Amino acid sequence: FPGGGFTSADHEKFSEMRRALANAGFVVAAAEYRVVPDKFPAILEDAKSAVRYLRAHAEEYGIDPDRIGVLGDSAGGYLSQMTGVTNGEKQFDKGDWLNVSSDVQAAVTIYGLSDLTTIGEGFGPEIDKVHESPASTEALLVNGPAFRTYPGASIMADRKAALAASPLGHVDGSEPPFLILHGALDPLVSPTQSAKLYRALKAKNVDAEYVLVDNAQHGDLPWFQKPVIERVVNWFVKVLKPVKAEESEGAVL
């Protein structure tokens, strides 16, 4: 799932990672999804539709339907998290191919968001004010834009709704294995977002790994270099365990 701050979802992003996964034997798909002004859960409904599509067409694409993983960065990382933590939550299954499951067997999140109410945590009061604005993208995602008599609302206006739209609001111990990566110098999404997710998953005895990448920011060069890409590919190989070439391969979305 490509990042884009909930305002874009260009499926052509992160081609280096996708090629590396394909070279490792995975079937790789890149999915676009609805962005603001569409409100949550549209974004998650689209992600789950993409998973169901791949599972429904597994034979056609040579996919093992029992071994599907998700990967995303930034807003796409949030979406990868949400897809993983909502395994079995049927209320988010809308659209086609409803006869197949949208559950995934592995999830990787790269500088993703786990708590929409604390994206700028630790960055100081000026950044806090930005995220408290009704015009922040997370507020638009959860509450929608101002329109006619509706003035819009801060992400803090309805904490219950914000939590329902946040991965941390769904962790219950039934999650698949997670690989969580974040840049130590990220100036946009606080690394505490990933640390919180890791702690929540481990508290429920979920198989989770957390990697804080030194000298990495948000979407800068370290994320497109060999060490990070190999870490992700090797983790998927370990968790999804690709089989012989003549058999069905796992898939990464």
Task: Give the ranges of each region predicted by the language model.
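Acidic catalytic loop of the alpha/beta-hydrolase fold
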Residues: 116, 185-189
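Catalytic histidine neighborhood in serine/cysteine hydrolases
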Residues: 202-219
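Mobile cap/lid helix-loop segments that gate and shape the active-site cleft of serine hydrolases
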Residues: 121-170, 176, 203
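Primarily recognizes the serine-hydrolase "nucleophile elbow" in alpha/beta-hydrolase
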Residues: 24, 49-127
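Short beta-strand/loop motif that positions the catalytic acidic residue
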Residues: 174, 179-182, 186
